[in-house]
A protein has these predicted regions:
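Short, well-formed alpha-helical segments that are part of the catalytic scaffolds
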Residues: 10-23
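Active-site-proximal specificity loops/subdomain of glycosyltransferases
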Residues: 35-86
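Short beta-strand-to-loop acidic/aromatic patch adjacent to the donor-nucleotide binding site
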Residues: 88-99
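Boundary detector for helix-to-coil junctions that initiate low-complexity/charged tails
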Residues: 97, 283-346
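Conserved donor-nucleotide/metal-binding helix-loop-beta segment in metal-dependent transferases, i.e.
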Residues: 102-131
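Catalytic core and acceptor-binding pocket of nucleotide-sugar-dependent glycosyltransferases
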Residues: 135-230
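PAPS-dependent sulfotransferase catalytic core
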Residues: 190-283, 288-289
């Protein structure tokens, strides 16, 4: 099966291709869209079809591409690549930092000819507005709502099967609304596809990614991953004093599973601790900063004072929070069942 990467980081992509080769050896048709300079430095561990961005877009578009933010640039490139005919009708859409953590089979992405979408959020609830990623999610939400589509976020930081025809249809639909390219290719394709080509897509499934967000509790989960099948790779997590300190970033075939499990275990334990406002002394994180600093000690004292308050709130509000969570889940299941039933009606 074809897997298509965007990248401008040859070292990161080289390592990611090693992880993909080990855990997804069947994804052996590798296409990389990147600046020519990146392709020249790639030294890939697998056979790669490299497509220089400069050749895909032509000289007239280079200056415009350079002026775009990260999300707009990626959407522009993926749509242009789909139009070029360089990708298959159904391909795995990936980035250079999406790394498998365990053996993954093709059925993980396609079931009975239908693409499987892994959703991470309801965009009606996504209120962050700090990066081009956030703004692309908001624009996608507004466009999908206008077009009468669902509005789940499939920007789950893992590879997913993308239907080339549906991607181009969705891009055309938003292109009739605006000249902006600040959209999310995964989110548009899956929501638009489920509305207009439901026979090509399965029911949404929960995303299965570790390190999205980078640290647990950077924002509330809309749905928790039931397992960790992929890692959203952050190089700084492997620095001394950080969460994955001591674990190599490059894959060691003899220790791949052991290293993957060690990362999962550290991530899960940090999730449990941070949820109780307890942050390890020796691990850098967004709340305390680097370990051993004066600012970190002051922040630690602050969170220590908050822990009794949090425990009291949890006790007093336990029943209400449980009921709300159960109600929200039931409503979401009923709405999705109703929508699918309506689609199946003649």
């Amino acid at each position: 099966m074809q897997i298509v990467f965007l990248s401008n980081r040859p070292e990161v992509l080289r390592e990611t291709l090693g992880h993909v080769r080990h855990f997804m050896p069947w994804a052996d048709d590798v296409v990389v869209l990147a600046p020519a300079a990146t392709l020249d430095r790639l030294d890939a561990p697998v056979a790669v079809t490299g497509i220089p961005e400069e050749d895909l877009l032509g000289p007239d578009a280079r200056e415009e591409l350079a002026s775009l933010d990260h999300a707009s640039r990626n959407f522009t490139l993926r749509v242009a690549l789909a139009r070029s005919g360089a990708v298959q009708d159904l391909f795995l859409c990936s980035d250079d930092d999406f790394r498998p953590l365990k053996p993954i089979e093709p059925a993980f992405f396609v079931e009975d000819g239908r693409s499987i979408g892994y959703a991470s959020y309801d965009l009606a609830l996504w209120r962050r507005n700090e990066t081009s990623f956030d703004r692309a999610q908001h624009a996608s939400y507004q466009a999908l709502t206008y077009l009468g589509c669902e509005h789940l976020s499939y920007a789950s930081h893992m590879p997913m099967a993308v239907d080339r025809e549906v991607l181009l249809e969705a891009a055309g639909a938003v292109g009739r609304l605006t000249d902006s390219m600040q959209f999310c290719e995964w989110t548009l394709t899956y929501n638009y596809g489920r509305r207009h080509h439901p026979e090509r897509f399965t029911e949404p499934r929960p995303f299965v990614v570790m390190c999205w967000p980078q640290y647990p509790h950077e924002w509330p989960f809309w749905v928790r991953p039931p397992e960790y099948a992929f890692e959203n790779f952050y190089p700084d997590l492997y620095l001394p004093g950080h969460l994955f300190d001591g674990i190599p970033t490059a894959l060691d075939p003899d220790l791949a599973e052991r290293h993957a499990f060690e990362k999962m275990l550290r991530w899960y334990r940090f999730d449990l601790d941070a949820g109780q406002l307890h942050f390890p002394d020796d691990v850098a994180n967004p709340w305390l900063g680097e370990p051993g600093t004066g600012a970190g000690r002051a922040r630690r004292a602050f969170f220590s004072a908050l822990r009794p308050v949090r425990r009291a709130y949890e006790y007093l509000a336990l029943e209400e929070r449980t009921q709300l969570a159960e109600l929200a889940g039931a409503i979401a299941r009923l709405e999705r069942s109703r929508n699918d039933t309506e689609r199946d009606l003649p």
